A protein has these predicted regions:
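Active-site alpha-helical segments that house and flank conserved acidic catalytic motifs
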Residues: 122-147, 206-213, 255-258, 267-297, ...
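Conserved N-terminal diphosphate/IPP-binding helix and adjacent helical/loop segment
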Residues: 29, 33-129, 134, 138, ...
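Divalent-cation-assisted or electrostatically stabilized phosphate/pyrophosphate-binding catalytic cores
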Residues: 149-177, 229-246, 296-322, 336-337, ...
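Aromatic (phenylalanine/tyrosine) cluster motif
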Residues: 3-4, 16, 31
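All-alpha helical catalytic cores of prenyl diphosphate-utilizing isoprenoid enzymes
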Residues: 69-76, 90-98, 174-182, 189-293
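Hydrophobic, low-acid, alpha-helix-prone terminal segments
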Residues: 12-13
Length: 406
């Protein structure tokens, strides 16, 4: 149906209201087919999402729940089951951007026969990235002392409620995050033999783990940075984004797709960095911006969460840089306090707006997105596959956050 709709649109155009030659008709049918393929093969987000969701649940259940031959005291099984159920709950929802990018990177670079032969294995690899992310978010929520994740109680909060113990709840949250991180490696390892460059894929996954772990260390270190040097804070924050966010959000998914498509590890890494690094930075800047201009119904988290936590962000640094003396002192005093009231959260957002920090962030996002698109255009892809990859990457940079650059 999509094919005939695509052809119909072309035949309804002015060119088709005139007599055309057979070659011209065939060319238009070919373009109609390309449009159809875009709808049904390249950008099948809804179909991909259904497969990703069901497969993640299956993979997580298989790993997290005790098996029949697992020995565990009957008195302890309820807690083990609680953790396994939470593993599934924590894995539900989300945009699945990383998995979708893994699939579309593979589609953009793989030959048709490889796409058909290896898709199921690649689907599991894409799910492995999402499972890892869930584990990282569980740990992140403990570090940030967050109450909510995707509109539901964060894992450690759910455990604390279920066990009536905050200490045990935090401990179980740490173990759940570890379990999901291990599950991601297990999933990738099981499909490696079915993928081109499978051993390189597993090595890239382990490197991704390492980079995120280093990124979390650096993220905590940034919180000790003084606020009187906003330029240094910007540099340090962007460096954290590279390690903690871009590494597994954009760089690794692109790299996995390229490796599985048959590209050698050195070229895959170089190309994934060229496209994925600016894209990942833009994504995190957009996420930070959403924290102050979004809504809790969209994010699943309260607006101004970073402000409440007193996080040192690029937005904050840009605001301090552009503020007058009074505004600068007000911002620094807020962030140096032990906590911030709801009135102060609203005031901080006002100052971000008044100092131009929000527009500065939109400008950064636009520049980084243009850098990523330019890198894609150098990859010698066909017009169709280049468009596919650009569209896949555009999911990470919602248009609301990108201002037009002259």
């Amino acid at each position: 149906a999509a094919f005939f709709e695509a052809c119909g649109r072309r035949m309804a155009s002015s060119a088709f209201r005139k007599m055309i030659s057979v070659p011209q008709l065939l060319q238009s049918l070919r373009f109609g087919l390309v449009e159809c393929l875009w709808i049904t093969v390249g950008m099948t987000s809804s179909s991909d999402l259904e497969q990703i969701e069901s497969r993640i649940v299956s993979l997580v259940k298989d790993f997290a729940f005790l098996h029949a031959d697992d020995s565990a005291a009957s008195s302890c099984r309820p807690i083990a089951d609680m953790v396994a159920k939470q593993a599934v709950t924590s894995s539900e929802g989300g945009k699945r951007l990383r998995a979708l990018l893994t699939l579309d990177s593979f589609r953009a670079f793989a030959s048709e026969d490889v796409r058909e032969r290896d898709f199921d294995a690649l689907l599991d690899l894409a799910c492995a990235v999402e499972v890892f992310q869930t584990g990282a978010l569980v740990h992140d929520d403990i570090i940030d002392d967050s109450d909510l994740r995707r509109g539901k109680p964060s894992a450690h909060r759910a455990f604390s409620t279920g066990t009536h113990s905050e200490a045990i709840g935090h401990g179980l949250g740490i173990m759940l995050g570890d379990m999901l991180a291990t599950a991601s490696v297990d999933i990738a390892d099981k499909v490696a033999s079915k993928l081109t460059h499978g051993s390189d894929v597993v090595a890239a996954l382990l490197n991704m783990h390492r980079e995120v772990e280093i990124g979390q260390v650096l993220d905590l270190a940034v919180e000790l940075n003084p606020l009187d040097d906003p330029d240094e804070l910007v540099e340090a924050s962007l460096n954290v984004f590279r390690w903690k966010t871009a590494s597994y959000t954009t760089i690794a998914p692109l790299e996995f797709g390229m490796l599985a498509a048959g590209i050698g590890k050195d070229d895959a890494r170089k190309q994934a960095l060229a496209v994925g690094l600016p894209l990942g930075l833009a994504f995190q800047l957009a996420d930070d911006l959403l924290d102050v201009v979004g809504s809790s119904s969209n994010t699943g988290k309260p607006v101004g969460g970073d402000i409440r936590e007193g996080k040192r962000t690029v937005l904050l640094a840009d605001a301090i840089n552009a503020a007058n003396d009074t505004q600068r002192r007000e911002l620094i005093d807020m962030w140096e306090a032990d906590s911030r009231s709801e009135t102060q959260v609203k005031r901080a957002i006002e100052l971000f707006e008044q100092t131009g920090a929000i527009e500065r962030s939109r400008g950064r996002i636009a520049d980084l997105w243009n850098e990523s698109k330019t890198a894609i255009e150098t990859l010698s892809l066909s017009e169709y596959h280049e468009s596919l990859l650009i569209e896949a990457c555009s999911r990470f940079v919602p248009s609301i956050h990108v201002q037009t650059r002259a």
